[in-house]
Amino acid sequence: MLVPAGLALGSNSDKKPMSTQTLPNAISGTNATASASEASARPWYDIVQATLKRNDVKLVAYVPDKVFTPLIKNLHADKDFLAFATAREEEALGILSGAWMGGRRGAVLMQTSGFGTIPNALASLVVPYQIPAIMFVSERGTLGEFNLGQALVCRTMRPVLESLAVEHHTITRHDELEFIVDRSVKQSFATQAAVAFILSPLLTAGRVFEN
């Protein structure tokens, strides 16, 4: 057997002790676990804010909502964002549409009941004129809801989005939030089509869990 010069069979002199830090993540899992822990330590609203900023979505209209309060406060405190309240949700969609035509990207925050005000704005403006409206809906009407009005809109919200061919995602898991929002926002602007993110109480610990 030929042995390359300088290499002695059976010698461990040139070998370094193996460390789990040098192993791929798929084997050691150390870095992957650390990353997962860091992600889970971030509140959902921080993830949404960071993802919007990364995708240059800097204009955010909203109708005040308790679930979205921490996100709204953070947006107002961040000089990179222009956040403002509107009287109704369809007004917010109109402003977003005008902003898009003027070269700005925007999002709207609303509660489930507020979604009931926007089907006409979606059907007559956002969808036919290909406005990539980014919509976040704090979900009410399920998991112990006490308000019948919220429950009725919750039952019809997804069928309305389906009938208008508006992509929508119901997000229940913290570890899926960033990926779903980031990729869907990118797709929304690339295809010029609206997208709705329905944030489950399982994600936000929303109002239905207060009682």
Language-model regions: role of each:
Residues 1-30:
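N-terminal amphipathic/basic-hydrophobic helices that include classical n-h-c signal peptides
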